[in-house]
């Protein structure tokens, strides 16, 4: 079967079964994440970049995500016996002239840390970097608690999402009007 991470699928088909397949593609890694973002914003988004605070990505962010399509992405800890997690932010420039930022954290040590995630819309065009990561991580992020969360993102957009609590995490997000 073809690799899923780094691809675009129909937004309506995004779900846990697809994200489980993305996790499986990452192999036997103790800290990893499969991410799906469904674009139901009414406009398109174009990938800017991914910034990894810890860990890495094996695939490139899908470049162009039309309305009613979902992007699939993944991250994992660095290979080898290293005490790192998969912690990052990535950014998409939206056709409305603003930037969609997504942050996720799958830590190495669950004695001190938990899974966290957040989504934010930034005015204008902004690449993901340490500042964007910190803005969302230290802002008011959602815990990866196996529960659905939603909020108003501003600019006429809403977000609904869920992240699992495991070291092999799934993050599913829907951006809508």
From Swiss-Prot:
Residues 11-30 are annotated as: N-terminal region. It holds the Pfam family Anemone_cytotox. Keywords: Cytolysis, Ion transport, Membrane, Nematocyst, Secreted, Target cell membrane, Target membrane, Toxin, Transmembrane, Transport. Residues 3-12 are annotated as: Plays an important role in the hemolytic activity. The lineage of its organism: Eukaryota, Metazoa, Cnidaria, Anthozoa, Hexacorallia. This is DELTA-stichotoxin-Hmg2b. It is found in: Secreted; Nematocyst; Target cell membrane. The record marks 113 as: Important in the initial contact with the lipid membrane. It comes from the Eukaryota. Pore-forming protein that forms cations-selective hydrophilic pores of around 1 nm and causes cytolysis. Pore formation is a multi-step process that involves specific recognition of membrane sphingomyelin (but neither cholesterol nor phosphatidylcholine) using aromatic rich region and adjacent phosphocholine (POC) binding site, firm binding to the membrane (mainly driven by hydrophobic interactions) accompanied by the transfer of the N-terminal region to the lipid-water interface and finally pore formation after oligomerization of monomers This toxin shows hemolytic activity. One of its GO terms (molecular function) is channel activity. Phosphocholine binds at residues 54, 87, 105, 107, 133, 137-138.
